[in-house]
């Protein structure tokens, strides 16, 4: 049975799914209103060391870098419309392959060309992040984002992190007004 999380809530993967080795992180959303322009949201992952920064550019997984250099995290591809039910974009994580110096993997969704298109998360509804045991396709945890993020153009949906030798997942729901560039700058990537 899937654990439904509220903002800030967390779940121990070793308790919720003790045998899980491979995680599918599914992210979804719907464009509430548009002016006819494309509304392209992009999921990405950042593999963070204990200092809260990436170890290098290869720890930023997104549509132009689909797999981490160690193969532990893979982006399954860019969905440019967000149309339809279910996951709009997803990432796969091999928990046993994540390097020991990676303490946390954060999952961020950004709006492509948000400033030029005058788009924000205020025009997005039904946003969610879910963790699925990729070995048996059982949903382990889900967080439905409900906050009004009227000016934000990037959103940290959730994070996988190590705590006392086990993996946990936390629902975050933190918005950023500066889009992908501000998220990259915070975690040690030069996005220019």
Swiss-Prot record:
Q: Which residues cross the membrane?
A: none
In its UniProt record, which GO terms are filed under biological process? Answer: response to tellurium ion
A Pfam family it matches? TerD
Note the InterPro entries from the entry: Stress/Tellurium_Resist, TerD
Going by the UniProt record, its keywords in alphabetical order are:
Plasmid, Tellurium resistance
CDD domains listed in its UniProt record:
TerD_like
Tell me which PANTHER family the record gives: CAMP-BINDING PROTEIN 1-RELATED, GENERAL STRESS PROTEIN 16U
Similarity-based family: Belongs to the CAPAB/TerDEXZ family.
Function, in words: Not known; seems to contribute to the tellurium resistance (Ter) mechanism. Also involved in phage inhibition (Phi) and colicin resistance (PacB).
Name of the protein: Tellurium resistance protein TerD
């Amino acid at each position: 049975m899937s654990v439904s999380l509220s903002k800030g809530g967390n779940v121990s993967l070793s308790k919720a799914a003790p045998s899980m080795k491979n995680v599918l992180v599914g992210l979804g959303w719907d464009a509430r209103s548009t002016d006819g322009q494309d509304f392209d949201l992009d999921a990405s992952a950042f593999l963070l060391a204990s200092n809260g920064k990436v170890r290098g550019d290869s720890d930023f997984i997104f549509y132009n870098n689909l797999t981490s250099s160690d193969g532990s995290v893979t982006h399954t591809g860019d969905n440019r419309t967000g149309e339809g039910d279910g996951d709009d974009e997803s990432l796969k994580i091999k928990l046993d392959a994540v390097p020991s110096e990676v303490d946390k993997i954060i999952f961020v969704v950004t709006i492509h060309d948000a400033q030029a298109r005058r788009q924000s998360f205020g025009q997005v509804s039904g946003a969610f992040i879910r963790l699925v045991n990729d070995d048996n396709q059982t949903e382990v945890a889900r967080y439905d984002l409900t906050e009004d993020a009227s000016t934000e153009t990037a959103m940290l949906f959730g994070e996988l992190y190590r705590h006392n030798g086990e993996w946990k997942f936390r629902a975050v729901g933190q918005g950023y007004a500066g889009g992908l560039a501000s998220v990259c700058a915070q975690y040690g990537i030069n996005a220019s």
